[in-house]
Amino acid sequence: MNITRRLLGVALSAALASISFSQATFAGTAQSLGAESVIETIKKRGVIKIGLDLFVPWSMRNKDGDLVGFEPDVGNKLAADMGVEVEFIPTKWAGIIPALVAGKFDVIISGMTVTPSRNLTVNFSEPYAFSGLTILSNTAMTKGMALEDYNSEDITFSCRRGATPCVFIQNKFPKAKLLMFDEDGASTQEVLNGNAHATMATEPGPSQDARRNPETLNVPFNIAFDAGGEGFAMRKSDPDALAYFNSWIRRHNHTGWLKTTHDYWFRGDAWHDQVE
C-alpha cells in the first residue's frame, strides 16, 4: 500500500512538473514570437520604416522635394494611429522586395499588386486599394491599330522593371519587344520620344500623361487590364503584423478614410499644382 502511494505520488509530481514546464515553455514561446514581431520592433523604436518607390500619384516629390501622394498619406496615417514617427525609404522597384526581406524597412506600402508569385517571398495584407492597367500609346505610331495588332514583332513596349505591367505585357503581347526602365517616367519618355510604341501602367498615370501631351500620347482603349488589389507587403512568419495591418485596413475601409484619400489622389486634380 505504501509503495503504491509512493509510486502514485511520484507519478503525480512528474505530471505536475510536466504541465508546469509545458506552460512555461508555451509562455516563453509566445513571448518570444511577440517580441520578434515587427509590430513590437516598431513600438520600441518609435518609428515605422516604410519602403516605397516613386510613381504618380502613389508617391512623388513635390516642388519642395518632399514626398506626397496616396502612399505617404497612408503611411503618415498608419504611423499616427500607432503613435510612432514615420520614415519613408525610397527604393527602386526591382529591389524593393529583397530590401524588405533583408530588413531595410518594416513594410512595403507602394501600390504593390498582390500576386501568387510575390506571395512566395512575402506576405500581403488585405487590399487597401484597387486599380487596373491601361495602355498609353504614341498616337502617330499606333494610328488605326486594333488591340491584337500590338502583339507583333514590329511593336515595342516599355515598362518599369519588376512591376506588374512588365509581366502582363510579356503574357498578353509575347511577340512584342520590351524595353525595361527603373522608373515609370523613363518608360513614358520612351513613348514620347518615339522609341517605343506604347507602355502600360496603373491608372490614373496613363490618362494624366495623355492629358499633358495631347499632341503625342493617347489611351487608345477604354479597358482596365489585369484589375486587382494592392496590399501592404511584409516579411514571412509574422502573424502579429499581418493581423494588425489587416485590422487597420478594415477599420479605415469602414470609416471611408481610405476611399476619400484614394479619390483625392486618383480622381481629382487639386494636388497637381504641388508637383507641376
Model regions: which residues?
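N-terminal export leaders
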Residues: R5-G9
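A ligand-binding cleft/hinge motif common to bilobed small-molecule-binding domains
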Residues: G95-P98, M112-L120, F168-N171, L192-D226
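Extracytoplasmic small-molecule ligand-binding "clamshell" domains
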Residues: G28-G111, L120
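Bilobed "Venus flytrap"/periplasmic-binding protein-like clamshell domains
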Residues: K49, D53-P57, L67-A80, T113, ...
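Acidic, polar ligand-binding/catalytic clefts
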Residues: N76, A80, E85-N151, L217-N218, ...
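Extended ligand-binding regions for polar small-molecule ligands
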Residues: G28-L33, P72-D81, M141, E148, ...
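Short helix-initiation/N-cap motifs at beta->coil->alpha
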Residues: E36, F88-P98, K143-M145, R161, ...
